[in-house]
Amino acid sequence: MSQNLILILNCGSSSLKFAILDPINGDEKLSGLAESFYLDDARIKWKFNGEKGNADLDAGAAHTEALNFIVSNILTDELKQSIGAIGHRIVHGGEKFTSSVVITDEVVKGIEEVIQFAPLHNPAHLIGIQEAFRIFPELKDRNVAVFDTAFHTTMPEQAYLYALPYSLYKDHGVRRYGAHGTSHYFVSREAARRLNVAEDKVNVITCHLGNGGSVSAIRHGECIDTSMGLTPLEGLVMGTRSGDIDPAIIFYMHDTLGMSVEEINNTLTKKSGLLGLTEVTSDCRYAEDNYETDDAARRAMEVYCYRLAKYIGSYMAVIGERLDAIVFTGGIGENSAHVREITLNHLKLFGYQVDDARNLAARFGNEGVITAEGSPLAMVIATNEELVIAQDTARLTITK
């Protein structure tokens, strides 16, 4: 049997997403999620050949145990033998990695060197890499790292530098790196294809909206600015993350309120955003469903969309020429007609007019243009980060 399928591993701090794809046609053979690592209720669920399955993992199980379960209990011998390479999603590659690379000892060292910028994710990615080497030794030279930061490495200095002492950047790498790059890359290319614009000519603003969220300005096919910064805390209002705040708030929380550094970090990353504004949940669907009847839900939705519209408007200025489309993607971007409507209503100055029927239709797997005839284009495109990872992995290994 030919080895032409790609195993994709996305190791989070307490979870593991996995999939097996055909990199040519995107056909998904297997997908799944193991979660609640290190807890008593660690579990795994998957979909294989159209059939769903789930199981409890041993209490305290983590990445190693989950991968062992996948190989021993889910993968058939035939499917194992068809895996030709392994692609790893890596959240942070720093300045060193500007594109996907075959994993070597030097690459592992490079991922380790930027752990401080992704302290929850990069260590988990390294575990996934080592476990892949152990479980599939015959594929050791066919493991590929695909970096979420790579697409943003085309940002110019004026976009990625903070107005801090330059030595913080020069000596410590303190700058804006962005995130969700694989998603922004995919939907920008897909927008170019659908609009019949060359990839190196397309100008789009891409909005990846999920529990985390970011916006990117893409000019001539390259990212020239993005809303996330040194870490994924900067930028938009998110599920539990504050996004942009006055940095002096941190000093106020510490000096006046007596909060520790750990408490402040926990507040900004896990207790803010939609959760902080609603005081109920980080789920955007709650704010959407209760928008008309609950003041907190309305408040959360308005702040969320206002911040998003501000970024989109500023990126119109940054692109500075013809804008082909605003693209919404991610769980919220693809499914929340309300978020899209409120956001685009802030942009009426630029001629944007939502078509209600189109906007409502573009949900739950449906895509397309959501603005009215004669309006500048805004559209929904479903992201497919796994396909990008599979294609990059195949390009660097199987088809090289």
From Swiss-Prot:
Keywords: ATP-binding, Cytoplasm, Kinase, Magnesium, Metal-binding, Nucleotide-binding, Transferase. Its EC number is 2.7.2.1. The active site is at D148 (proton donor/acceptor). Pfam families: Acetate_kinase. The record marks H180, R241 as: Transition state stabilizer. Its cofactor is Mg(2+); Mn(2+). Mg(2+). Can also accept Mn(2+). The keyword Transferase applies. ATP binds at K17, H208, L209, G210, N211, G212, D283, C284, R285, G331, I332, G333, E334, N335. InterPro entries: Ac/propionate_kinase (IPR004372), Aliphatic_acid_kin_short-chain (IPR000890), Aliphatic_acid_kinase_CS (IPR023865), ATPase_NBD (IPR043129). One of its GO terms (cellular component) is cytosol. It is found in: Cytoplasm. Substrate binds at R89. It catalyses: acetate + ATP = acetyl phosphate + ADP. Mg(2+) binds at N10, E385. Transmembrane segments: none annotated. GO terms for molecular function: acetate kinase activity; ATP binding; magnesium ion binding. Belongs to the acetokinase family. NCBIfam families: ackA. Catalyzes the formation of acetyl phosphate from acetate and ATP. Can also catalyze the reverse reaction. PANTHER family: ACETATE KINASE. Homodimer. This is Acetate kinase.
